[in-house]
C-alpha cells in the first residue's frame, strides 16, 4: 500500500470510489514507516462510527456517561474518528486531546467525568501530575469508573489491570482494537472476558490470501 501511494499520490491506485466521494482525510501514525493517507467517504465514516460504537458500548460506555477523549486529534484516526465512535454510544464526549494534563485533572473534577479514553500508559502520567500539582488528591478522588484503552500494548498484563483497579478504582477495558487502513476500531473487551469480541462481522470479512495465486487459505488458530 505504501508503494502504491508513493507511485500514485496521495491515495494510491486502489481507491474503491471516485476522489470526489471522499469527505475525510486521515493519516496513519507512521511509527513503522512512511505514514499512509486514508480517504473516507460519508458512508465509510458512518460505518466506521457504528462499528466503533459497538466496541465502546461492549466495553461498558453508556448514555449516562461523560467520557473524556485523550488521544491525538492531529490527522490520526484515534482522534476525531474515535471521538465519533464514543459519541455513537450516546455518551457525552469531551474532546480533550493530548497534553495539558493539569487542565485535564481540573476538567475531570469540574465536569463530573466518569470515563476516560486514552492509551494504557497515560494513567501513569496523570498519577505523576496529581502527586506533583494536586496535594491531597488521589486518582480515586477523580471518580472515574471506566478506562477505555487503545493505541498501545500493555493492557493484557493482569498485574497492570489490577493496579489500575486498585489505584484508580476504575474498570480497565481494551475498548479500541483496530488497524487504521481497515477499521480504526473493530474489536473490544466486555465485562465478562479479557479476550476481544469481533464487532464488524456484518461489514468486514477477514480472509487469508495466498499472495502468489490469489487463492483463499484456511484460517487456523496458532
Predicted regions and their residues:
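Conserved AMP-binding/adenylate-forming
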Residues: 149, 154-222
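AMP-binding/adenylate-forming
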Residues: 41-55, 66-125
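Beta-strand-connecting loops/turns
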Residues: 64-65, 222
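Glycine-rich helix-loop-beta junction characteristic of Rossmann-like nucleotide cofactor-binding loops
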Residues: 57-61, 85, 139
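Conserved helix-loop-beta element of the AMP-binding
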Residues: 66-68, 133-155
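Nucleotide 5′-phosphate-binding alpha/beta core
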Residues: 1-27, 33-50, 54-58, 62-64
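Conserved S/T- and glycine-rich ATP-binding loop of Class I adenylate-forming
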Residues: 28-31, 67, 116, 178
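Adenylate-forming
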Residues: 123-142, 158-165
